[in-house]
């Protein structure tokens, strides 16, 4: 699911321009999510994520969710040790890009949204929200919906799940049919970490995906054992 139909690219382009209030950000997004090492974390991933989130566009904090989506995989290194900083660098990007390219009036209206989006992008490292969100129900709801949508791929149908897992292997320069022992162990640990999370999906809206996602994780873990 790496290639994206032209009409979907145009839709993403228009949505990006509207979100940031400028045409300057889209070329940066298109370039980053089109990097050659990417096979899953591409524009197609953004389109899929926005599709999962479509029912929540009327949420009070939709602008926060939208900013977090654009930023959350902006930096996606797949080499050691750079990959450890992906989330932190992506979070910093949303602050830097808005300061550099958005208008003063946009920044005044969206300053708090950018700050929260920064924190949500950081949260994708553990897929758990900062403790401070617990005292703000609207923030907590927005954060849970965003993080859950990012994990919704785990509840995909078998063919899509297989496509996703093979794409992750390709991103790490692996032959998906014969990955290295080191990759197999690292991938298994990452999947086991997700499987151990309780709850896996934190929002009531995505919670029904849990049984299928857990079965899928069990299947993938067994294949890497």
Identify what each model region corresponds to.
Residues 49, 62-79, 90, 117-125:
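His-Asp-centered metal-binding catalytic motifs of divalent-metal-dependent phosphohydrolases/nucleases
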Residues 33, 37, 73-79, 98, ...:
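Short amphipathic alpha-helical interaction patches enriched in hydrophobic/aromatic residues
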Residues 24, 60-64, 85, 112-116:
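Alpha-helix N-cap and coil->helix boundary residues
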Residues 2-7, 11-15, 34-41, 51-62, ...:
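Divalent metal-dependent phosphate-bond-processing catalytic cores, especially two-metal-ion Mg2+/Mn2+ enzymes
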Residues 93, 97-149:
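Charged mid-protein connector segments
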Residues 13-32, 45:
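Short alpha-helical hairpin
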Residues 49, 85-100:
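An active-site-proximal "capping" alpha-helix that borders the catalytic cofactor pocket
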Residues 41-44, 85:
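Aromatic- and histidine-enriched alpha-helix N-cap/loop-to-helix transition segments
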């Amino acid at each position: 699911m790496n290639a994206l139909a032209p009409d979907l690219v145009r839709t993403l382009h228009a949505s990006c321009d509207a979100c940031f209030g400028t045409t300057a950000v889209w070329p940066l997004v298109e370039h980053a999510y089109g990097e050659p090492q990417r096979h899953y974390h591409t524009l197609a991933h953004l389109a899929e994520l926005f599709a999962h989130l479509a029912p929540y566009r009327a949420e009070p904090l939709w602008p926060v969710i939208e900013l977090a989506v654009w930023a959350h995989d902006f930096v996606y290194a797949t080499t050691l040790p750079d990959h450890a900083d992906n989330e932190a660098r992506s979070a910093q990007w949303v602050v830097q890009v808005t300061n550099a390219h958005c208008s003063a009036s946009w920044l005044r209206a969206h300053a708090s949204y950018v700050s929260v989006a920064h924190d949500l992008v950081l949260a994708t490292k553990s897929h758990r929200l900062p403790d401070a969100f617990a005292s703000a129900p609207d923030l907590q709801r927005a954060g849970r919906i965003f993080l859950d949508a990012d994990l919704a791929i785990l509840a995909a149908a078998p063919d899509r799940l297989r496509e996703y897992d093979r794409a992750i292997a390709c991103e790490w320069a692996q032959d998906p049919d014969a990955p290295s022992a080191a990759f197999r162990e690292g991938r298994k640990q990452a999947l086991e970490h997700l499987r151990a999370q309780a709850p896996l999906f934190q929002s009531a809206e995505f919670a029904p995906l849990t049984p299928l996602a857990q079965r899928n994780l069990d299947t993938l873990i067994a294949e890497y054992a």
